[in-house]
Amino acid sequence: MCGIVGAVAQRDIAEILIEGLRRLEYRGYDSAGLAVVDNEKNMFRLREVGKVQVLADEVDKQPVLGGTGIAHTRWATHGEPNEKNAHPHVSDYIAVVHNGIIENYEELRVQLIALGYQFISDTDTEVIAHLVHWEQKQGGTLLEAIQRVIPRLRGAYGAVIMDSRDPGTIIAARSGSPLVIGLGVGENFLASDQLALLPVTRRFIFLEEGDIAEVTRRTVRIFNTQGKPVEREQIESNIQYDAGDKGIYRHYMQKEIYEQPMAIKSTLERRLSHGQVDLSELGPNAAKLLAKVEHIQIVACGTSYNAGMVSRYWFEALAGIPCDVEIASEFRYRKSARRSGSLLITLSQSGETADTLAALRLSKELGYLTSLTVCNVAGSSLVRESDFALMTKAGAEIGVASTKAFTTQLTVLLMLVAYLGRLKGVDAEQEQEIVHALHALPSRIEGMLSKDKIIEVLAEDFSDKHHALFLGRGDQYPIAVEGALKLKEISYIHAEAYAAGELKHGPLALIDADMPVIIVAPNNELLEKLKSNIEEVRARGGLLYVFADQDAGFTDSEGMKIIPLPHVEELIAPIFYTVPLQLLSYHVALIKGTDVDQPRNLAKSVTVE
């Protein structure tokens, strides 16, 4: 949600700021702006509603010169998406960009109005600008003023601030919303996501919770919550990402669907050996500690939560470990029993999801045995704060609707199931079966992608529909949930998912000739039960679309279309059956003409509550 870019350099940095914002477009936004200070201490500010390109066009019309600047893409929380609410916000010579929410902004606003400040916008961000301005007038440096302001702010935020009277310095403050410093040669940068800075540097410092950083062209000074100078680790990034390169694909989502075989291969690389899963990357003490796990608690949001629901079936059936899955925003506010023998697993593509981070921190207070994160971004907050981390190696995922991050999360979770099962004394033959299935997975998905044209034609049936129902059983039920989420995210069709056995308990009332029902039907022990559910829908005139194993015994009939899929190993069937539902959602969205990569009202990384 939202994006921040900042730069301090000897060269003009407007183009760097604009390019950084372009690389953050995938996070979702409704307006964009920048402020640049030149060597004569003149500040130039420009804000536009709409795409970053609108801002770029305005910059082209009136060249913006200067080597110190900040820029922002805004996703509205306080105040409508219009120019006056777009960032940066200013108070005389102070300019601020900010991600997150200041929970006590109304109280601060009243205090500032009493001091004579006038508010132009409806945002919570403007209080930061005025507070810093007020503290500056009381004396001290910009850094000292900000250090006095921060304790007065309640909420989760990341803010970058500059003073036009002091070109060559920008200050960053992190409290719950990610910020990263990019290290250059005679120039330094700031952003909310390292992707924004890849054209100018590969060296990064990730700010930790409560950090305040003073960044100049040649120096970076970081202070912790006690105001003491601290050193933070420098990380060399190997992420490959070209924001403008969709290659032969129309959208990032389409590209990322097709990248899944390679993403899974990368995720499996060096982790499968001689019929075993090799997770030695967890360190020498991991096996001894994880062998003590008596219960697993998974917390996640959105698509990652659906991955957690699939893995619950695996952890219990294959590793024999009791497992619960909970939405992170519910877990963090529920009064939980203490869990001394419990492993907390967090799932997040970005590693910065606010509710998931809060759940991790809560688990430490509750006495959990240990924590492990499955994440796609090295150096992210979840990776740094968890005891153990297993990285998905999906590469940058730009489309808001997650595809390859989901399937690589499931891939890692299945490896973890095999590893924990071995620690618990599960038969070695089962681990060998998991390893065999995982080896086969990339080629199985490549075969699935060859069905794309069939699904493209099928999608035409959905162009005039307003609702859809997804059904599955067992570990395919969460896949039905994920399919419904994808369809509603990018095509704006209202879609719900149920365990097929729940039809009689309510959803059957929705079935009529205008309600498409999408069913995932692998050839497993639940197939006959699922066929009974299918007949219940047929008897009531429902429109059935069944993604079925080619050996499951289905044939097309009136009111029922069968999409036959190649047989796949049962262990990896949930991952495999995800792909046709991704393709269906993508093609329906194309037909409806929605913004596939940046669907309305949604953001890629939700870093606030």
UniProtKB/Swiss-Prot annotation:
Coiled coil: none annotated. Its EC number is 2.6.1.16. Keywords: Aminotransferase, Cytoplasm, Glutamine amidotransferase, Repeat, Transferase. It comes from the Bacteria. It catalyses: D-fructose 6-phosphate + L-glutamine = D-glucosamine 6-phosphate + L-glutamate. The active site is at C2 (nucleophile), K604 (for fru-6p isomerization activity). Residues 2-218 form the Glutamine amidotransferase type-2 domain. Residues 286-426, 458-599 form the SIS domain. It is found in: Cytoplasm. The keyword Protein transport does not apply. One of its GO terms (biological process) is protein N-linked glycosylation. GO terms for cellular component: cytosol. One of its GO terms (molecular function) is carbohydrate derivative binding. The keyword Cytoplasm applies. Its main location: cytoplasm. Pfam families: GATase_6, SIS. Homodimer. Catalyzes the first step in hexosamine metabolism, converting fructose-6P into glucosamine-6P using glutamine as a nitrogen source. This is Glutamine--fructose-6-phosphate aminotransferase [isomerizing].
